[in-house]
Amino acid sequence: MAKDILIHQIIEVLERAGFMVSNQCNIRPRSFDLAARQGNTLLFCKVLYNIDGLNEETAREMKSLAKYLNGYPILIGAKTRDQLLEDSVVYMRYDIPALSIQTLYDYFVENVPPLVSAAPGGLYVSIDGDVLKEARMNVSMSLGALASELGVSRRTISKYEEGQMDASIDIVLHLEEILDMALAKSIDILRSFEKELDPANVKEEAHEMKTPPNDNILNLIYTLGYDVLSTNQAPFKAVSKDTSSTFLTGVSEYSNAMVKRAHLMSSISNVIETQSVFIIEGKSRYKFVEDTVLIERDELNTIADSDDLDTLIHERAKRHKEE
């Protein structure tokens, strides 16, 4: 299946689920292919025919963007290694959930969450430990008796009941048959895999936000009072944020390639619900391209602080909407 067909199918699924979907990111390199929003749920979607094609650098940027913009990274594909992705199964690549189009459809359109996760060694299911313990006690079955029936240790049953261990599909089916009770816990794709925040990582990320960017223009924006998250693979060069506003930030001379990026940034910013700004090195022919505000470098040099820049951006955006 060609990637373009895959992306087209994904857009259809997301739109059917009520998502607003951005234009496809067709500029290389790209850390994500689509942005999509439904209410408070913002997705950064990476599409790869083989999900093993995701590399660590791209995954890191996806996760940084998602965290910075209160969204979720998600990987959608068709195969892994030499086999097709199983439906109703969630795979993980660099802590990003990966799934098939059918699983995407079931989750967002049919509201049917998957039950199975892929891990080294096979496919596993999370057991609702409280339900398991209650069901076992209701039939007056000891840990030892249930363990013997399953062919596992008493300690394993205890771990199932304490929620400390997932089980194979066969074990869960056998358990449900013995106890006549549904025990599998569904997977909230967007939230089940959120990691507990490591204080060291939080401190490191906070330090990065306080460190001036290497790019001269981004550094200038930083000195005005913005936190600036630089990107290497997104259609924009950074995301700039202060206490009252957030804007996707591009930096370039005025050119046809810049105009193309500005159109794409407009589409993405509309989905993300931020402003989109391009800082132009040299002269600009226009004040905006679609919904992306264009500001010449010389104009930026006259700005005193973030309030002044916010005012300029909002006034120029308002003028565009009135025209």
From Swiss-Prot:
User: Which keywords accompany this UniProt record?
Assistant: DNA-binding, Transcription, Transcription regulation
Q: Name one GO molecular function term.
A: DNA-binding transcription factor activity
* One protein family per Pfam: HTH_3
Which residues carry the record's DNA-binding region feature? 143-162
Occurrences of domain HTH cro/C1-type (ranges)? 132-190
Return the SUPFAM superfamilies for the record: lambda repressor-like DNA-binding domains
Say yes or no: keyword Transcription present: yes
| Keyword Hydrolase (UniProt) | no
SMART domains, per database record: HTH_XRE
Name the source's superkingdom. Archaea
For this protein, the record's NCBIfam families field holds: PRK04140.1
Q: What protein am I looking at?
A: Putative HTH-type transcriptional regulatory protein Mbur_1811
